[in-house]
From Swiss-Prot:
Its main location: membrane. The potassium channel is probably composed of a homo- or heterotetrameric complex of pore-forming subunits. May interact with KAT1. Interacts with SLAC1. Residues 249-268 dip into the membrane without crossing it. Expressed in guard cells of hypocotyls, stems leaves and petioles. Detected also in the phloem of minor veins and in flower at a lower level. Highly selective inward-rectifying potassium channel. This voltage-dependent channel could mediate long-term potassium influx into guard cells leading to stomatal opening. Assuming opened or closed conformations in response to the voltage difference across the membrane, the channel is activated by hyperpolarization. The channel activity is enhanced upon external acidification. The lineage of its organism: Eukaryota, Viridiplantae, Streptophyta, Embryophyta, Tracheophyta. This is Potassium channel KAT2. It is found in: Membrane. GO terms for molecular function: voltage-gated potassium channel activity. The keyword Disulfide bond does not apply. Residues 1-63, 113-134, 187-200, 294-697 are cytoplasmic. Glycans are attached at N158. Residues 85-91, 156-165, 222-248, 269-272 are extracellular. It holds the Pfam family cNMP_binding.
Amino acid sequence: MSISCTRNFFKRFCVEEYNMDTFKHSSFLSADLLPSLGARINQSTKLRKHIISPFDPRFRGWEMWLVILVIYSAWICPFEFAFITYKKDALFIIDNIVNGFFAIDIILTFFVAYLDSHSYLLVDKPKKIAIRYLSTWFAFDVCSTAPFQSLSLLFKYNGSEIGFRVLSMLRLWRLRRVSSLFARLEKDIRFNYFWTRCTKLISVTLFAVHCAGCFAYLIADQYHDPTKTWIGAVYPNFKETSVWSRYVTALYWSITTLTTTGYGDLHAENPREMLFFVFFMLFNLGFTSYLIGNMTNLVVHWTSRTRNFRDTVRAASEFASRNQLPPNIQDQMLSHICLKFKTEGLKQQEALNGLPKAIRSSIANYLFFPIVQNVYLFHGVSRNFLFQLVSDIDAEYFPPREDVILQNEAPTDLYILVSGAVDFTVYVGEEDQVQGKAVVGDAFGEIGVLCYTPQPFTVRTTELSQILRISKKSLMSAMRAHVEDGRVIMNNLFMKLRGQQSIAIDDPNSEPESLLKEWLVGGSKTGEGNASDQGHGHKYLQLHDSENIDMGSTEWRDSRRSGYGETKRVREHTIEIEEGEKPNKEFDGKGCSDADLTSFEFHSQEAYPYCRSNIQIKQHEAAKPKDKRVTIHLKSRDKDLSKLIILPASIEELLRLAGEKFGYSFTKVTNAENAEIDDEDVIRDGDHLYILINENS
């Protein structure tokens, strides 16, 4: 397991972050590749022959090997410059092998494609690659790779001459590879940014300490009087001590000076050292500012969430105290803020909002589809309906004893409990009475949303709960787009209400069809739904009766007296409702005369005790229902006449109209089976009606 983890860790350095599981070779999906506007983004992935992609994992591995050699060079160059004379020993052989690797890299660079800074496309023409390299870093790479230590042996002076030792310091040019590596790792999402920055700052600090110590020792070593140096004043025979002891002493002086500790035991003894120490301390001023600034930025960024959280808590506490809010509301406010802070990393709503809708829909479908599918309200609906619905779902966390829904609150959302538990309470007198409980997988708030009624319960959490919220607008759009699924939802709600003892249904033959038709605001045949969405003062209910029952003005008056039976007929027709923004808000009637307004009340408590609405209708603007055509027959012993007419609003009007057509006085209406009809609601379009003559006329 440890070997596999180590292999995967080092693989991150060699493979681009977007190519880990997709392409093995010559992959171009890189964070550095960004085609310009209008350019082709599907650039061919096949380069010219003998041209290497800079994003090839094998080339990335080669670069990582060179970075390791650069780290070695960064340490050995100042160390050899100050402490070691050039000799044909093992260190001499290692240095030349390292130089050989960098010489190979110089040749290899002529065959590596580069990223054009203007088009952000790879350039694989050998001529352009060569011109670009020769005009930029070629000379510096050659100077940093030249074996000056070996060349010094060809001259009469030995390899310890200061001139060749200075030229060997050109190998520090290779450090640009380390800088490029850190710049790439800081943008790589697979590596922690904080620890990447800390590693970079620590590396820079150690390199500065190492170089300063080596340079300080070199000045003391080259001074004509060893006892008049910063190290000779303490160790007169320091040149006779081991290299390790001298190197540790130099590091000790360097770190105490860099950290401005300055114990005073090691200090400058001659003007040459004093001048170097002055410049080194000036360098320390800028370098310390760089370190402190970067570390402060990292720490502040790390603790900014906590600081913002404490500021929010303090502001909420001051607001509650200033407005003298009750203790229970204060507790809910603080609990909600604390829970939001703890679950901020789980939601990341801002990050999701920045993604394209297709990606957000895929995430929501993966997270919420199985949960919504098991809710009783959506049993039997199509997958397309659920997919459209889950795309607009929001997940929220609620602490214990927090109100999710308030009793008599305007219905705005439907909730699904994912984890935790909630209680349904009703405020009676001066105390709350628990009417029920919801467990994981239950939905609540559906009665208010689907029945256009204020919420019948207060829903309060009893423990830490995760709840999915579906807005009324999203549910409305989905049900309009899938009418059959909307009918299934209403049937599921109806069966749930019939099965609950606390929500009794007196009429078992009632159907939820009329509720569905009332809920579908602004149907497909009309554009009235847009008026409501745009803030206009009208709301239209498209209520289509499956039996096309006619309704006259007399029934509007009768509906106010006869309760549910007549109200059902009223609701099953197309009407125009003048009201405010909220469905359960009464229209104030301003601007209309008393003669224009007919007020009535939907009393559907017998079937749905929580589905009620007080709405005022502007009668003269009410849409006319579809007229029913019926055939009336004169039924007598010696005559059989028939006429096709428009069905009037009542049986009395029908008998009067038949009397005008046939010239007789009629008393009864029957159908083809000789069954007497005393209610016009049972008459359908196209029926044949038989009129009985009053024998006394």
